[in-house]
Amino acid sequence: NHKSGDENFEQGQQFLIENGAKEGVVTTESGLQYLVLEEGTGTEHPTKNSKVTVHYHGTLIDGTVFDSSVERGEPISFALKQVIKGWQEGLTYMVEGQKVRLFIPSQLAYGKGGSGPIPPSATLIFDVELISIK
């Protein structure tokens, strides 16, 4: 993917505008979007200080998979404050057992620098299942 950050950003913005109009998609004040895929059984929401265990599958808006705990077959645990802003915010809306698709604008992800396989200014999509909160 050799597109410029500006091109990625514009395509991401266009994607988010169209995506935001879809049924069930919620757009928050920050620009994060999410869609509940499966309701959870929990009642508590994680806070920014929580440690969570999740399964996730991350793609670019063109469907390219860049990271997936699902494909590795092993969930991941982390402190919420250690991850990108889109996850910090998105996971606070979730409860245990819930599956959500997060649509994360680049400014809430890796921004202009990108990261590894993630190009500059890329909008990211993550399917996240919240397994547990500690």
Q: For each of these PLM feature ranges, what is it?
A:
Residues 1-134:
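Cross-family detector of peptidyl-prolyl cis-trans isomerase
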